[in-house]
């Protein structure tokens, strides 16, 4: 099984909240695709609560598009990580980490302005696979924590596992 890019970085050294360029690629038609690791929690130290991350998934996707789309950037998808420590965001374009961090900050401010659970987009049985598993209060707690902590940048070159480490971990 091939080793995925996300597993070639040392999760014990990741800062959070922080933005990291997880992958850059070019499509056969020449489009630049960038995948960002939006790390909300330090791996193996904390996780996002399931109801809060689910509510955030519904809100974050729209708010990030409001603040980041345009000027050569279009978000394809924002999805929560299975480990519940953040989100992956795939997009067309190559915005730098500072631009993404600014959009993330603005999106968290937007989350805090949502005052009623009924305002959560697609919160119904027809458009959501687990529509009863939401918490606006948990989403607010997550947003407040991100804003209070500030959003940094994780760099692949400082997080890269060495070839020796990878060989030891995956003999």
From Swiss-Prot:
InterPro entries per the UniProt record, alphabetical: LuxS_sf, Metalloenz_LuxS/M16, S-ribosylhomocysteinase
Catalytic reaction annotation: S-(5-deoxy-D-ribos-5-yl)-L-homocysteine = (S)-4,5-dihydroxypentane-2,3-dione + L-homocysteine
This enzyme's EC code(s): 4.4.1.21
Keyword annotations of the record: Autoinducer synthesis, Iron, Lyase, Metal-binding, Quorum sensing
Gene Ontology biological process terms in this record: quorum sensing
Molecular function GO labels: iron ion binding; S-ribosylhomocysteine lyase activity
Pfam families per UniProt: LuxS
Residue sites binding Fe cation per the record: 54, 58, 128
Cofactor(s), names only, from the UniProt record: Fe cation
Cofactor: binding comment: Binds 1 Fe cation per subunit.
Enzyme class, broadest EC rank: lyase
PANTHER family: S-RIBOSYLHOMOCYSTEINE LYASE
NCBIfam families found in the cross-reference section: PRK02260.1-2
Subunit structure of this chain's protein: Homodimer.
Family that this chain belongs to: Belongs to the LuxS family.
Chain's role: Involved in the synthesis of autoinducer 2 (AI-2) which is secreted by bacteria and is used to communicate both the cell density and the metabolic potential of the environment. The regulation of gene expression in response to changes in cell density is called quorum sensing. Catalyzes the transformation of S-ribosylhomocysteine (RHC) to homocysteine (HC) and 4,5-dihydroxy-2,3-pentadione (DPD).
Protein name in UniProt: S-ribosylhomocysteine lyase
Organism for this UniProt entry: Edwardsiella ictaluri (strain 93-146)
């Amino acid at each position: 099984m091939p080793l995925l890019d996300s597993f070639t970085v040392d999760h014990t050294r990741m800062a959070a909240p922080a933005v990291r360029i997880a992958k850059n690629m070019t499509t056969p038609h020449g489009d630049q695709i960038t995948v960002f690791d939006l790390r909300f929690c330090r791996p193996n130290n904390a996780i996002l609560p399931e109801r809060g991350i689910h509510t955030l998934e519904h809100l974050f996707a729209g708010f990030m598009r409001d603040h980041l789309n345009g000027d050569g950037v279009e978000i394809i998808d924002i999805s929560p990580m299975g480990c519940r420590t953040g989100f992956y965001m795939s997009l067309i374009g190559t915005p730098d980490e500072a631009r993404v961090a600014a959009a993330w900050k603005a999106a968290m401010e937007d989350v805090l302005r949502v005052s009623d659970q009924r305002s959560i987009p697609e919160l119904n049985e027809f458009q959501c696979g687990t529509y009863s598993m939401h918490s606006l209060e948990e989403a607010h707690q997550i947003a407040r924590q991100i804003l209070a902590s500030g959003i940094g940048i994780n760099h692949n070159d400082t997080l890269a596992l060495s070839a020796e480490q990878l060989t030891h971990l995956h003999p």
